[in-house]
């Protein structure tokens, strides 16, 4: 395990308190560049843009915000900002700039003003975690909300009007699932048949697949809760498929997080069954692949830190997303598909963490790590890229270059003679003023 040091960092001002899932990265204004969204317990959403230390704009919500998200939740072809409070208030913000420009050619309808939601609706309270994704394979995105009482609910936006620009609909409840343990993460991954599957983490490094049975329903649209409580319990039990990832669990109640749909390459390389990762508060990390018969464990790593957040991020640029896990003390682990581990230390305690693409500088999205500390600061480490995950040395790098072998042949050095090539490289790097030693025997250390 090697350590890396990222030095490109910006500090953002944030004086509020937040829940772990009230932070995300996404394109809130539909300009193809991602912003940072943070919601606090006072009901304020701060949107940060570029490397400005102060929020680009703020939004006012009702209640304590527990989760925020960015996505096309209304299926209108543009992203909206979603904020959900613990009291059950669902807020939608349209932060796309107006099409009409002012005299200077800038959109100033948003900047400097506190934004009000374009839509607000009350849903069941005690929200904890949120997901905006297509969970049933119909091409439309749904809203999935996890609750503190071990319940998960799925909603869909139902449009009531004809206008494509204005929101004239409402959220309609699709299904309610009852889980055995606390819900800490929601994610979607590709199943063995290539269709999306809704996953929810369960304590003890376990997870459950939630079946979207409304796809089979015909007739009336899905109701919010069903006719009676008794008619819900039996289907709910059938529609939750629990998976234990280990026969030996040290603590079956330990908090667990998961992330799914981990990319395995560009284009056709990323097709097939989805990869997903799990982490626990006692330091267990696993990468798994969902197979048709049984899940396949690709690797398992045990660390001595309390892991509270799990993300995915392509830090090498090869299309393979690495698993990123963060601990409360700022220790961050980046692990690739081959179990190569790189760690990065932030010298402060962390209250919330996220990773993804963010347009911090240079007018483009780059891989970023975002840490919310306890000292009223948010640290954004941008351009967190690595040339490779595995450890290497100069000789191995040079051996991949054809001109290296031709130069050694000119000097009469055998490329397979490692002591001689190392001595030659040492002399070239540290004693270039000395005359070159062409004979292989003269390159060897007399001692």
Curated annotation (Swiss-Prot):
Pfam families: Itfg2. One of its GO terms (cellular component) is intracellular membrane-bounded organelle. It is found in: Lysosome membrane. One of its GO terms (biological process) is cellular response to glucose starvation. Gene3D superfamilies: Integrin alpha, N-terminal (2.130.10.130). InterPro entries: Integrin_alpha_N, KICSTOR_ITFG2, WD40_repeat_dom_sf. Keywords: Lysosome, Membrane, Phosphoprotein, Repeat. FG-GAP repeats lie at residues 19-48, 126-155. Its main location: membrane. It comes from the Eukaryota. The keyword Protease does not apply. The modification Phosphoserine is found at residues 104, 220. Part of the KICSTOR complex composed of KPTN, ITFG2, KICS2 and SZT2. SZT2 probably serves as a link between the other three proteins in the KICSTOR complex and may mediate the direct interaction with the GATOR complex via GATOR1. The KICSTOR complex interacts directly with the GATOR1 complex and most probably indirectly with the GATOR2 complex in an amino acid-independent manner. As part of the KICSTOR complex functions in the amino acid-sensing branch of the TORC1 signaling pathway. Recruits, in an amino acid-independent manner, the GATOR1 complex to the lysosomal membranes and allows its interaction with GATOR2 and the RAG GTPases. Functions upstream of the RAG GTPases and is required to negatively regulate mTORC1 signaling in absence of amino acids. In absence of the KICSTOR complex mTORC1 is constitutively localized to the lysosome and activated. The KICSTOR complex is also probably involved in the regulation of mTORC1 by glucose. This is KICSTOR complex protein ITFG2. It comes from Homo sapiens (Human).
């Amino acid at each position: 395990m090697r350590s890396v040091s990222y030095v490109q960092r910006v500090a953002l001002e944030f004086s509020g308190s937040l829940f772990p899932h009230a932070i995300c990265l996404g394109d809130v204004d539909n300009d193809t560049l991602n912003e940072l969204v943070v919601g606090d317990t006072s009901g304020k959403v701060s949107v940060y843009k570029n490397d400005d230390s102060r929020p680009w704009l703020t939004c006012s919500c009702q209640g304590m915000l527990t989760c925020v998200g960015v996505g096309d939740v209304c299926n209108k072809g543009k992203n909206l900002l979603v904020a959900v409070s613990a009291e059950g208030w669902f807020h939608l913000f349209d932060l796309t700039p107006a099409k009409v420009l002012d005299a200077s050619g800038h959109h100033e309808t948003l900047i400097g003003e506190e934004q009000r939601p374009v839509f607000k609706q009350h849903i069941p309270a005690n929200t904890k975690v949120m997901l905006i994704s297509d969970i049933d394979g119909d091409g439309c995105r749904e809203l999935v909300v996890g609750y503190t009482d071990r319940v998960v609910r799925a909603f869909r936006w139902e449009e009531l009007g004809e206008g494509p620009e204005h929101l004239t609909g409402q959220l309609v409840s699709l299904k309610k699932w009852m889980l055995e343990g606390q819900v800490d993460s929601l994610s979607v991954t590709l199943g063995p048949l290539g269709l999306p599957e809704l996953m929810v983490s369960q304590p003890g490094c376990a997870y459950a697949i939630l079946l979207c049975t409304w796809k089979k329903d015909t007739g009336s649209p899905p109701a919010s809760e069903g006719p009676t409580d008794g008619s819900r319990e039996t289907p709910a039990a059938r529609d939750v498929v629990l998976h234990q990832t280990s026969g030996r669990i040290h603590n079956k109640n330990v908090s667990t997080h998961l992330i799914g749909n981990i990319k395995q390459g560009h284009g056709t390389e990323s097709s097939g069954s989805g990869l997903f990762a799990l982490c626990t508060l006692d330091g267990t990390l696993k990468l798994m692949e969902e197979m048709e018969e049984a899940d396949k464990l690709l690797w398992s790593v045990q660390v001595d830190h309390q892991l509270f957040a799990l993300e995915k991020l392509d830090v090498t640029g090869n299309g393979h997303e690495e698993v990123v896990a963060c601990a409360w003390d700022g220790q961050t682990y980046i692990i690739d598909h081959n179990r190569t581990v790189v760690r990065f230390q932030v010298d402060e305690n962390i209250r919330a963490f996220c990773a993804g693409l963010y347009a911090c500088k240079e007018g483009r999205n780059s891989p970023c790590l975002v840490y919310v500390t306890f000292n009223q600061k948010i640290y954004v480490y941008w351009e967190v890229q690595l040339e490779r995950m595995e450890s290497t040395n100069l000789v191995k790098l040079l051996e991949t270059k054809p001109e290296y072998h031709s130069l050694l042949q000119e000097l009469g050095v055998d490329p397979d003679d490692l002591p001689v090539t190392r001595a030659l490289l040492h002399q070239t790097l540290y004693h270039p003023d000395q005359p070159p030693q062409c004979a292989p025997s003269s390159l060897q250390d007399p001692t």
